[in-house]
């Protein structure tokens, strides 16, 4: 990181794929002596993965935040309400501690904006695919995204990288296949 100052990081991610994306970075930062706090929501196996890693964490939505309704208006209203709840819960969480950097795939950029903490958001979709993310891009300091991703007017905030999200956890320097899985699928000679 360039200097010996130990920093306080807050990672907030809301999908199991982001656990895999951020896992090596979080473990590296912890190994280097930085303080890393983690906030999540209940989503599929995300909490199980975080527990398995042995990380301490805060679950902002232990019951999840997805609406079970099918009416489009109800889904929209539930989404707006959950967005506001998420921002409020992040506000309360970050009021307890001073952070140097926020890393997220969600609303933590808003908290970073008004708390004046640099925030990095990860996105691997073009802006025209998920237009509603514009608010998060506006409030983010930087957007981490594959080079090929078109972020439109937010390209000036993009920190592009060659590759895709899976590159972070499937790279040969990081990924080690489990021998029992290779045997199970008769892949031992092929690995």
Q: Where are the model-predicted features located?
A:
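Short amphipathic alpha-helix
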Residues: 16-30
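An amphipathic, basic-hydrophobic alpha-helix
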Residues: 72-98
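A nucleotide-sugar donor-handling region in carbohydrate enzymes
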Residues: 141-191
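A conserved, positively charged/aromatic
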Residues: 120-122, 129, 133-143
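Structural motif
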Residues: 8, 99-101, 142
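Short, acidic/turn-prone active-site loops that include or flank metal/cofactor-
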Residues: 16, 40, 60-67, 123-130, ...
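An aromatic- and histidine-rich active-site surface loop
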Residues: 44, 101-115
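Conserved nucleotide-sugar phosphate-binding/catalytic loop shared by glycosyltransferases and other
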Residues: 6, 13, 31-79
């Amino acid at each position: 990181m360039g200097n010996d100052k130990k920093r306080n990081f807050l990672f907030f991610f809301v999908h199991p794929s982001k656990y895999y994306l951020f896992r090596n970075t979080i473990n590296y930062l912890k190994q280097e002596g930085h303080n890393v706090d983690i906030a999540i929501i209940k989503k599929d196996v995300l909490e199980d993965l975080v527990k398995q890693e042995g990380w301490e964490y805060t679950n902002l939505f232990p019951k999840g935040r997805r609406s079970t309704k099918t009416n489009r208006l109800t889904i929209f209203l539930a989404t707006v309400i959950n967005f506001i709840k998420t921002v409020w819960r992040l506000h309360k969480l970050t009021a307890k501690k001073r952070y140097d950097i926020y890393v997220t795939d969600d609303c933590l950029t808003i908290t970073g904006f008004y708390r004046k903490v640099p925030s990095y958001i990860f996105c691997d979709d073009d802006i025209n695919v998920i237009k509603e993310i514009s608010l998060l891009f506006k409030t983010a300091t930087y957007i981490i995204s594959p080079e090929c991703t078109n972020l439109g007017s937010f390209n000036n905030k993009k920190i592009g990288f060659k590759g895709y999200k899976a590159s972070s956890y499937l790279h040969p320097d990081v990924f080690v296949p489990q021998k029992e899985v290779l045997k199970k699928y008769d892949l031992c000679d092929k690995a």
